[in-house]
Amino acid sequence: MAVGKNKGLSKGGKKGGKKKVVDPFSRKDWYDVKAPNMFQTRQIGKTLVNRTQGQRIASDYLKGRVFEVSLADLQKDIDPERSFRKFRLIAEDVQDRNVLCNFHGMDLTTDKYRSMVKKWQTLIEAIVEAKTVDGYLLRVFCIGFTFKDQQSQRKTCYAQQSQVRKIRARMTDIITNEVSGADLKQLVNKLALDSIAKDIEKSCQRIYPLHDVYIRKVKVLKKPRFDISKLLELHGDGGGKTTEAVVSAEGAVIDRPEGYEPPVQEAV
């Protein structure tokens, strides 16, 4: 064994030494996520973001986040007909420590969608693009299945192609009329109550009996230009004031006069 100096020990070990461990959560803040007033549950959760440092503004990193929430949680309802619907809400603005969200889409859970597909029946689906009164372009997916008559001795309940085309045309007409004749808030209420699917099922009974008719998915393809007053109106404000309206922790909007400045704190 060669006898000599250990260069690593003489120089004080490895380069840099032991680094100081910094908790990443010490640089982050919690923000409350607020749903529009069309839902009973206003605060749907909290989200994390890094604090504002220099040109990195925290609100810029919050805008555009999408939150997926069950309709049963939004409406405080344990009805199983609501639990399999998921609503997507997108963060559009930040007021104080509150993230104001707007409707961004709807979908069914995977287990519900797969449980409906069975043998010996015909699946009928329609895809419709329509624009609401306030300028939202939506793509709506509707699904339905043929229903076997209890008095029938046949094992199957397949519909003819002519009947499928008539049902799909009826679906398209009803969805187009419902979407184009309502604004976004009214349409979300219809989706929550599932009134469009019920109208389709009732209207198509004369062509062929249907069951499990649902609005399977809704996508927002295009939105109008962002308007803070309309967003505050969705969250409970009348839209009279713009930037002076602030949402409190309980979800209520507080109006502040123009030129309002917070008082200067003597101690921090």
UniProtKB/Swiss-Prot annotation:
Belongs to the eukaryotic ribosomal protein eS1 family. Essential for oogenesis; required for late follicle cell development. One of its GO terms (cellular component) is cytosolic small ribosomal subunit. PROSITE patterns: RIBOSOMAL_S3AE. The keyword Thylakoid does not apply. The gene is RpS3A. It is found in: Cytoplasm. It comes from Drosophila mojavensis (Fruit fly). Disulfide bonds: none annotated. Residues 1-21 are annotated as: Disordered. This is Small ribosomal subunit protein eS1. GO terms for molecular function: structural constituent of ribosome. One of its GO terms (biological process) is oogenesis. Keywords: Cytoplasm, Developmental protein, Differentiation, Oogenesis, Ribonucleoprotein, Ribosomal protein. InterPro entries: Ribosomal_eS1 (IPR001593), Ribosomal_eS1_CS (IPR018281), Ribosomal_eS1_euk (IPR027500). Its main location: cytoplasm. The keyword Ribonucleoprotein applies. Pfam families: Ribosomal_S3Ae. Signal peptide: none annotated. Component of the small ribosomal subunit. Mature ribosomes consist of a small (40S) and a large (60S) subunit. The 40S subunit contains about 33 different proteins and 1 molecule of RNA (18S). The 60S subunit contains about 49 different proteins and 3 molecules of RNA (28S, 5.8S and 5S).
